[in-house]
From Swiss-Prot:
HAMAP family: HisA. GO terms for biological process: L-histidine biosynthetic process; L-tryptophan biosynthetic process. Pfam families: His_biosynth. It is found in: Cytoplasm. This is 1-(5-phosphoribosyl)-5-[(5-phosphoribosylamino)methylideneamino] imidazole-4-carboxamide isomerase. It catalyses: 1-(5-phospho-beta-D-ribosyl)-5-[(5-phospho-beta-D-ribosylamino)methylideneamino]imidazole-4-carboxamide = 5-[(5-phospho-1-deoxy-D-ribulos-1-ylimino)methylamino]-1-(5-phospho-beta-D-ribosyl)imidazole-4-carboxamide. The active site is at D12 (proton acceptor), D131 (proton donor). Its main location: cytoplasm. It comes from Thermobifida fusca (strain YX). The lineage of its organism: Bacteria, Bacillati, Actinomycetota, Actinomycetes, Streptosporangiales. CDD domains: HisA. It is an enzyme of class 5 (isomerase). Keywords: Amino-acid biosynthesis, Cytoplasm, Histidine biosynthesis, Isomerase.
Length: 245
């Protein structure tokens, strides 16, 4: 049996609430109540991972650090923690929650030396988020440009980055389907695992992503489709298992 595509339901937190944004734009999308309840719902439905995001920290307007730490502590499954991790203090706080790994985005673009140091020190506990519009990276809560995707990828490869989380910003929260060409392109330039994020709208989208596992796609982060009931997590897990058989 081939490797199964890992599914990471997203719990994005702003102002203490679970939310989902459209194209990363503040104030868009739905609100879904208590983030711990959301995370426990996905755990109980069979998730092995949660992608937990502090949107306030990502946008640079405070944080939900204590809340996120308490959520990590109450879950029995692996957590990937993301949002506003851009210096030693925020990184150490994130790692101290006991999360399985952290996702660093903006910092990788604004401070490559720090990023290389963190990759060297923490290895597999650090994934780098590549948030992409076309072939340009989007920085700090996606409100600014952050340079060329492939130049940055080359630099991160040289630094020994263990894993990439690739988001097509234009697809995120839109239910318009993932950017398979972008994922293939990134996979062709690295032998490290790639986690896909953005645009998943249907079980067919998951089948298409699962078909890219041999090329290097390891996982898929799902948000809006799950919260809006496009399919259940149980259906999603069954679908990716079928593809792997």
């Amino acid at each position: 049996m081939a490797p199964i595509l890992e599914l990471l339901p997203a719990v994005d937190v702003a102002g203490g609430q679970a939310v989902q944004l459209v194209q990363g734009k503040d104030g868009t999308g739905g609100r879904y109540g208590d983030p711990l309840n959301a995370a426990l719902t996905w755990q109980n439905a069979g998730a092995e991972w949660i992608h937990l995001v502090d949107l306030d920290a990502a946008f640079g307007r405070g944080h939900n650090r204590e809340l996120l730490a308490s959520i990590v502590g109450k879950l029995d499954i692996k957590v990937e923690l993301s949002g506003g991790i851009r210096d030693d203090e925020s990184l150490n706080a994130a790692l101290a929650t006991g999360c399985h790994r952290v996702n660093i985005g903006t910092a990788a673009l604004e401070n490559p030396d720090w990023c290389a140091k963190v990759i060297a020190e923490h290895g597999d506990r650090v994934a780098i988020g590549l948030d992409v519009r076309g072939t340009t990276l989007a920085a700090r809560g996606w409100t600014r440009d952050g340079g060329d995707l492939y130049e940055t990828l080359e630099r991160l490869e040289a630094a020994g980055c263990a894993r990439y989380i690739v988001t097509d910003v234009n697809k995120d929260g839109t239910l318009k389907g993932p950017n398979l060409d972008l994922l293939r392109d990134v996979c062709s330039r690295t032998d490290k695992p790639v986690v896909a994020s953005g645009g998943i709208s249907s079980l067919d989208d998951l089948r298409a992503l699962a078909a890219l596992v041999p090329e290097g796609v390891e996982g898929a982060i799902m948000g809006t489709a799950l919260y809006e009931g496009a399919f259940t997590l149980e259906e999603a897990l069954a679908t990716v298992r079928e593809v792997a058989q």
